[in-house]
Amino acid sequence: MSEARRDSTSSLQRKKPPWLKLDIPAVVPPAAEEPSFLQPLRRQAFLRSVSMPAETARVPSPHHEPRRLALQRQTSITQTIRRGTADWFGVSKDSDSTQKWQRKSIRHCSQRYGKLKPQVIRELDLPSQDNVSLTSTETPPPLYVGPCQLGMQKIIDPLARGRAFRMADDTADGLSAPHTPVTPGAASLCSFSSSRSGFNRLPRRRKRESVAKMSFRAAAALVKGRSIRDGTLRRGQRRSFTPASFLEEDMVDFPDELDTSFFAREGVLHEELSTYPDEVFESPSEAALKDWEKAPDQADLTGGALDRSELERSHLMLPLERGWRKQKEGGTLAPQPKVRLRQEVVSAAGPRRGQRIAVPVRKLFAREKRPYGLGMVGRLTNRTYRKRIDSYVKRQIEDMDDHRPFFTYWLTFVHSLVTILAVCIYGIAPVGFSQHETVDSVLRKRGVYENVKYVQQENFWIGPSSEALIHLGAKFSPCMRQDPQVHNFILAAREREKHSACCVRNDRSGCVQTSKEECSSTLAVWVKWPVHPSAPDLAGNKRQFGSVCHQDPRVCDEPSSEDPHEWPEDITKWPICTKNSAGNHTNHPHMDCVITGRPCCIGTKGRCEITSREYCDFMKGYFHEEATLCSQVHCMDDVCGLLPFLNPEVPDQFYRLWLSLFLHAGILHCLVSVCFQMTVLRDLEKLAGWHRIAIIYLLSGVTGNLASAIFLPYRAEVGPAGSQFGILACLFVELFQSWQILARPWRAFFKLLAVVLFLFAFGLLPWIDNFAHISGFVSGLFLSFAFLPYISFGKFDLYRKRCQIIIFQAVFLGLLAGLVVLFYFYPVRCEWCEFLTCIPFTDKFCEKYELDAQLH
């Protein structure tokens, strides 16, 4: 048996190449005490070398003494609320959450407001500023290595970034050239624990790409005018998994055996992987071998270290040495070909099936983070950071993460759906900027045809009319409060109706309720009580007011006029009679005639007129077949629609302040809002989150509508004009908060100011409310200072932020309370205010907003 072992050993020695030398480090006896500063190693895969055979090594875990858990008091509800409120407003003492928000803010600022200062660019490590730095990471704590593995501790990552991999012979400028590894082909322990290592970001295994995602990618490529094949990265052979030369296992938790262990940015990783051939280390051709042997320069060949400047340009890690080539049967080892290898990067988790197909799709949907102050508007206005930014501010920018714009998507869906339904139900009004007139011959209440004219304001937004928008929920003061002018107008009309009577034609062909002046004395009889003998009695006396066509307290059964519920003397307070006892044979002229006119609510100011149905339909009014007097109907309830008033005499639809934010004047108006939301609003929501943006959006819109209802009470206004200008105010606040880190803040300010002034000038057109713009902008400015966290430039800024939150919240509440008082208790009548929101270039360019303008 021993002889067979000697034969086997000699056979192995004969097969061993002469150049192969095995240097196995001696095992150092375990020390009596393990170093306390070492970090325990959780996974044994980190101690396995790729260049050595994979053996099962047992690493003893460090001994931990059992510790008793410290008793802690449960946090009180007051402290929890206080801490949560501080975190929400961005004034928490938790440095992690504060730095995370501040880093995100600066990153957003770099995309929106232009170039940063030079010192910021040098110190800031953003994805858009890819500079190779060997001193960008901190030194990770060393891993705990068991006693049996102490002989393999010195494994140096040649190009690992950070102070953990610098030697004592660093140059004076703080940089040093990378050292070659002691064990070629081995994975460095520090590579796995470094913050720059790909092992800290192990991706989970994903499912194969769905048909829907591939269809969406193809549609996106066609929209961009590209071919579907151009949308993917070029590959050698199309396969759903990476060849075995990268990694042998399909799915690994941590790398046990790696050929290479150097990693770079994820973007470079996928880009490089997709361009490699199937086999990275292919055998060169004979002609290529001859050329390599003749090459005079051997510095850049296999095994040679790249120059530092070339490394910084490529941003890639050095590949490790190729393995030894198998000896030919001739007995001599074939010369190692000097092949310049591509700078490859292998993912720590290993390639997976479907990776080559998923890479272009991820690039298609990839979105860069929004640097604080440099969002979409910042890119349009060429904003940049300063050259120097404090490291504390820089960390705040880096820690910021983008939010998902849920509120923007929900708002866009609601706006689109409501606009489509409104146009489909109420139709489209005449398109234009002036007034549209319609003339036709219509049967009037006297029984003859007359030429009448209907005037309607044109809508250049391609949408419904003003009456339809009011019925849908537009901002309209007479529907939100008891307007003094409208109420006085209704009372005056009732006073005239109180002295009216039924005008009966002599041939009994018809009758209508009218005044004495409108009733012909030759062709008709004006049945006026108590002069006419048909006057009934009330408490022993003749009634002084009446008669009413087709209504008499003596013949009405429901509701009956019986003591103690007799109908009052004033006919404007009579109820609607739903059932008569005698029909048309009462021997009373005002009851036996054919009525030709009933109440019709015309216009948007509560005007009621007793007329024929044909005329009411032509004027697009609300005809009341059941009533005989205008006092028996409530026209404002018909005009406003929605929920009925609690008191028919007092409108109370205050919810129009926020309901109108979801309505639009037309299709074009909705498209403008959608474009604004998908650009500016979506960009800001990524910065602040949906809850903050929703608060600013809704409160700014409500404040803008409230101011518009005060100064333009008789104008129907829809759309989120105040909300959009409140969002524009957020851009100004973001600019002010990032003023210290921008290279040219004044230029960015004037560009943004020019955009806002242009939008204010655009508000001088009809159907656009500048009062909502101004009030929404001012309220949005206050709310942004209160609810938008920002970059902190020191401890003083933290206290300033707390004072800022309290002050601006108090100012906004004061502004809102003042507007509420003006609207409900001290109405303001401003005759020149309409010129601020619409300049009448012609007589018919602007709609007349005064009360008497629409009365025909």
Swiss-Prot record:
Domain of life of the source: Eukaryota
InterPro entries cross-referenced by the UniProt entry: Inactive_Rhomboid, iRhom1_2_N, Peptidase_S54_rhomboid_dom, Rhomboid-like_sf
Residue positions where Phosphothreonine is found in the record: T180, T183
Main location: endoplasmic reticulum
A GO BP annotation: regulation of protein secretion
Residues annotated with Phosphoserine modification: S76, S176, S391
Topology of this chain in the membrane: Multi-pass membrane protein
Disordered, as annotated region: 1-20
Keywords carried by this UniProt record: Endoplasmic reticulum, Glycoprotein, Golgi apparatus, Growth factor binding, Membrane, Phosphoprotein, Protein transport, Transmembrane, Transmembrane helix, Transport
Cellular component terms (Gene Ontology): endoplasmic reticulum membrane; Golgi membrane
Ranges facing Lumenal side: 434-656, 714-715, 769-773, 826-856
Glycosylation sites: N584
Transmembrane segments annotated in the record for this chain: 413-433, 657-677, 693-713, 716-736, 748-768, 774-794, 805-825
The keyword Transport is annotated on this UniProt entry: yes
Subcellular location: Endoplasmic reticulum membrane; Golgi apparatus membrane
Cytoplasmic compartment spans: 1-412, 678-692, 737-747, 795-804
GO molecular function list: growth factor binding
Subunit architecture: Homodimer, or homooligomer. Interacts with TGFA and HBEGF. Interacts with EGF; may retain EGF in the endoplasmic reticulum and regulates its degradation through the endoplasmic reticulum-associated degradation (ERAD). Interacts (via cytoplasmic N-terminus) with FRMD8/iTAP; this interaction leads to mutual protein stabilization. Interacts with ADAM17/TACE.
Family: Belongs to the peptidase S54 family.
Job description of the protein: Regulates ADAM17 protease, a sheddase of the epidermal growth factor (EGF) receptor ligands and TNF, thereby plays a role in sleep, cell survival, proliferation, migration and inflammation. Does not exhibit any protease activity on its own.
Protein name, entry field: Inactive rhomboid protein 1
Lineage, uppermost ranks: Eukaryota, Metazoa, Chordata, Craniata, Vertebrata
Gene: Rhbdf1
